[in-house]
Amino acid sequence: MGPTMRMTQVLSVNDLSPHMKRIILTGESLSDFPDDKESAHVKAIFPNPNLSDKKPKLGLYFGFKMFMRPYTVRSFDKQNLALTIDFAVNDHQGLATNWALEAKAGDYLGIAGPGDVKHLDINAKQHLFFGDITALPAIAATLEKLPENAIGHAYIQIPDKQDKQTLITPKGINIHWLVTPNKLTEDFLDGLKSQSNHLHDTAIFIAAEASVVKQLKSHLDNNCEYDKSTLYASAYWNQKR
């Protein structure tokens, strides 16, 4: 049995920055969507761009996975059945980017999930975040959940200074914006190296291009003492694909 699939429609589309669109989805199918899933992933199910039917096909049919892409629950308003997803968009012409760039109120999008939340211990003694713009929605959603006395650092790579967002975060969390079009930046590793090697009681979030995630994970394994049960490390995309 696969994840629950829901048909939704676009309620609104807003440009958050040059490389980020906020799309709010709605529909009666969201009536049983769970609360407290901010930062969890869902699978967006897109219409087949080669067909005239602009509704995505739901179900576990042959080839269905080619129309699915993972995204993050930015927020969910249970009362108004409004699911917010922030879409990172770039020059790459692909199924998801093309849909997001052209999305308008009334368009259809399927949603499967949600999965589990990303940050594994919001009450940890310290927090470290490393993510490019594709991970910004998950980082932003998690920062909003942290207790007021939380401390730590968030290193966020963005392609343009205009992609900076105003984040709601505890005063003890230092935000480091890494403005560079090179998504394979070494700045994440420099940020990790600037921390103590003793990272017990530290919740660590890593989400970026596959080789960057591998590099950071390797440094942790070879140089740091940390609790693997509070590490989230995921390749959100792969440059080789």
Task: Name these PLM-found stretches.
Residues 1-241:
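Extended, composition-driven regions rather than compact fold-specific motifs
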